[in-house]
Structure formats: C-alpha cells, structure tokens
Curated annotation (Swiss-Prot):
The gene is UL40. Signal peptide: none annotated. Keywords: Host-virus interaction, Modulation of host NK-cell activity by virus, Viral immunoevasion. It comes from Human cytomegalovirus (strain AD169) (HHV-5). Residues 15-23 are annotated as: HLA-E-binding epitope. Pfam families: UL40. GO terms for biological process: symbiont-mediated suppression of host natural killer cell activation. Belongs to the HHV-5 UL40 protein family. This is Protein UL40. Plays a role in the protection against host NK-cell cytotoxicity by up-regulating the cell surface expression of HLA-E independent of TAP (HLA-E has an inhibitory effect on the cytotoxic activity of the NK cell). Also promotes cell surface expression of UL18, another viral protein involved in NK-cell evasion.
Length: 221
C-alpha cells in the first residue's frame, strides 16, 4: 500500500513539476517586467514643500491607487497624502497658482463653500470641519484621474484654530510594495494553472478524495 501511495505521489509530482516550473518562471517574468516598467516616485502637489514629513505637513491618508500615465500604461501605486498648512510668515510651504503643464493640480475641499451661508475654509476663521468636506480628490494635469478618498478629511479638522490659514494637499505616488500586486498575480496564475483539465483531479486522487482509475483497474484484473 505504501509502495502504491509513493508511486501515485511520484506520478503526480512528475506531471505537475513542469507545469509548476513554467508557472513560476512566468510569474517571475511578470514581476520583473512590472518592476522595470513601474514609474518612479511622483510628487503630486499644489504646494512646493521643503519638508513633507514636518509638523506642517502631517500624513493624513495612505492607500492604493491606480495611476494612468500619458503613455497609456497603468500601474498600481501607493498614495501618500500630506496636509500642509501655512502657519506663519516664515513658512516652508510655498503655494503655486500657476503650475507647470506637467505638474498635477489637486482640487480639494479647502475651496469648498456651503451654499447655505457661503462659509469657506479660506476666508472664514470660525468654519467647522463639516463645512469643508473633501471626499474626492481630483488629480488634473498630464493625465486626468480621480481618487475617491472616503476617509480623507479636510485640513479644517482643527475646529478651534484660525482656519483662514492657507492649506494645500501634498500627494506622493510611489510604486506599490511587494504585496497586493504580487498576490493578485499569483492568484491569477493559480487560476490559470487550474485551467488544465487534469490539475485538480490529480491532486484529489493523490489525497485519496477521488478513486484512482489505475488502482481499480488493477483490482479488476
């Protein structure tokens, strides 16, 4: 019995080894191509920030986003959103009203006005955070995209501060880490491997879930 089980497992391994090797090589080639073709870290901002990690620019959101580039390529990127404030005359945040053609402009809730009383984050120092929604960040520039950031709030979260200060969002797009994209490729690869008609049946027979036709043929003989 042990000899037959060893033969059955060896047969399964012999059949599956070439397919597994081909699948592994294919996935590695896809991963290498993805790394080579992924764009470098991109700064998407309405403000020129000298220190994006300083106290004036805290990180307010981090997530995944698909970035579409003018070449037509699409890449999975990690999106970091910093909220930058101008708190004094000696500020490190320099706002630009005329970005270059290749600079993406972020339209966020700090320009949002309520239709009821006209309160704006920019000109009303007693505005509350609910007056300044920022549920969607529109990225406009070389390419047009829209990121639905449902958890991103406006810089007006500081209810008791002087909200007449100028605010801007500083966005950074960087290549996705070895995680979500890779697991997605492996999942597709496993499903593709399952397209072989005998893949699942061979595994089931090797585990004893399905009867082995060769085994029953020997018994009948």
């Amino acid at each position: 019995m042990n000899k037959f089980s060893n033969t059955r497992i060896g047969f399964t391994c012999a059949v599956m080894a070439p397919r597994t090797l081909i699948l592994t090589v294919g996935l590695l080639c896809m991963r290498i191509r993805s790394l080579l073709c992924s764009p470098a870290e991109t700064t998407v901002t309405t403000a020129a920030v000298t220190s994006a990690h300083g106290p004036l620019c805290p990180l307010v959101f981090q997530g995944w986003a698909y970035a579409v580039y003018h070449q037509g390529d699409m890449a999975l990127m990690t999106l970091d959103v910093y909220c930058c404030r101008q708190t004094s005359n000696n500020t490190v945040v320099a706002f630009s009203h005329h970005p270059a053609d290749n600079t993406l402009l972020i339209e966020v809730g700090n320009n949002t006005r309520r239709h009821v009383d006209g309160i704006s984050c920019q000109d009303h120092f007693r505005a509350q955070h609910q007056d300044c929604p920022a549920q969607t960040v529109h990225v406009r520039g070389v390419n047009e995209s829209a990121f639905g950031l449902t958890h991103l709030q406006s810089c007006c979260l500081n209810e008791h501060s002087q909200l007449s200060e100028r605010v801007a969002y500083h966005l950074k797009l960087r290549p996705a880490t070895f995680g979500l994209e890779t697991w997605a490729m492996y999942t597709v690869g496993i499903l593709a491997l399952g397209s072989f008609s005998s893949f699942y049946s061979q595994i089931a027979r090797s585990l004893g879930v399905l009867p082995n036709d060769h085994h029953y043929a020997l018994k009948k003989a």
